[in-house]
Swiss-Prot record:
GO MF term set: anthranilate synthase activity
Organism classification: Archaea, Methanobacteriati, Methanobacteriota, Methanomada group, Methanobacteria
Protein name: Anthranilate synthase component 2
Self-association and partners: Heterotetramer consisting of two non-identical subunits: a beta subunit (TrpG) and a large alpha subunit (TrpE).
Pfam families assigned: GATase (PF00117)
EC nos: 4.1.3.27
Biological process terms in GO annotation: L-tryptophan biosynthetic process
Residues annotated as domain Glutamine amidotransferase type-1: 3-196
Described function: Part of a heterotetrameric complex that catalyzes the two-step biosynthesis of anthranilate, an intermediate in the biosynthesis of L-tryptophan. In the first step, the glutamine-binding beta subunit (TrpG) of anthranilate synthase (AS) provides the glutamine amidotransferase activity which generates ammonia as a substrate that, along with chorismate, is used in the second step, catalyzed by the large alpha subunit of AS (TrpE) to produce anthranilate. In the absence of TrpG, TrpE can synthesize anthranilate directly from chorismate and high concentrations of ammonia.
Alphabetized Gene3D superfamilies for the sequence: 3.40.50.880
Top-rank lineage group of the source organism: Archaea
Active site positions: C89, H177, E179
GO cellular component terms given for this protein: cytosol
InterPro entries membership: Anth_synth/Amidotransfase, Class_I_gatase-like, GATASE, TrpG/PapA_dom
Length: 196
């Protein structure tokens, strides 16, 4: 049985997420299988049959509003709200968009390290506040258009949304890259997700 499914949005960072998750599982003594599928390799019915316990939607190029960029991921967000689901970068933007938020062009950042301020919620347990995180993105989730079902859980000093969670479901998003070497606390964030 696949316990953790990573959906790859054709991004090189997906391998880093896979490697980080695998290291954490080994360190925690968890014998869980991780499967990686590209966003156009499976239909939602195939994923239902896999019945993963946790899902990570990877970073990637493009816009979550375009199926050509986001593949099956929007369907996954709609279908699997009953289990822990984490979106990273494009995955985060897709979650925000799926629940009615506006995702727009922002200032492009590539490898920029910033301080992130968080609310101490479950993903940020044992994470310093603030902490340093690496950003690679050109789209941003607009704070003024945050859906009622979504809670902002982390921001930069200039109020750019860095993390969200659904108010009812175990659905989370991270704009920053926890798998980056420039995000020292990223391992703790991913560990907190995998422990859910």
């Amino acid at each position: 049985m696949v316990v953790i499914l990573i959906i790859d949005n054709y991004d090189s960072f997906t391998h880093n997420l896979y490697q980080l998750a695998g290291e954490i599982l080994r360190d925690e003594g968890m014998d869980e299988e991780i499967m990686v599928l590209r966003n156009d390799e499976a239909r939602i019915s195939d994923l239902r049959a896999l019945d993963p316990e946790k899902i990570i939607i990877s970073p990637g190029p493009g816009n979550p509003s375009r199926r050509s960029d986001f593949g099956v991921c929007m369907d996954v967000i709609g279908e699997f709200t009953d289990r822990p689901l984490l979106g990273v970068c494009l995955g985060h933007q897709g979650i925000f968009h799926a629940f009615g938020g506006r995702v727009d062009q922002g200032e492009p950042v590539h490898g920029k390290i910033v301080e992130v301020f968080h609310d101490g919620s479950e993903l940020f347990r044992d994470v310093p506040n603030p902490f340093r995180a690496t950003r690679y993105h050109s789209l941003v989730c607009r704070p003024e258009d945050t859906p009622a079902d979504i809670e902002v859980t982390a921001v930069t000093s200039d109020e750019i949304i860095m993390a969200i969670k659904h108010r009812e479901y175990p659905v989370y998003g991270l704009q920053f890259h926890p798998e980056s070497a420039g995000t020292p606390s990223g391992r703790t964030v991913i560990r907190n997700f995998l422990r859910m």
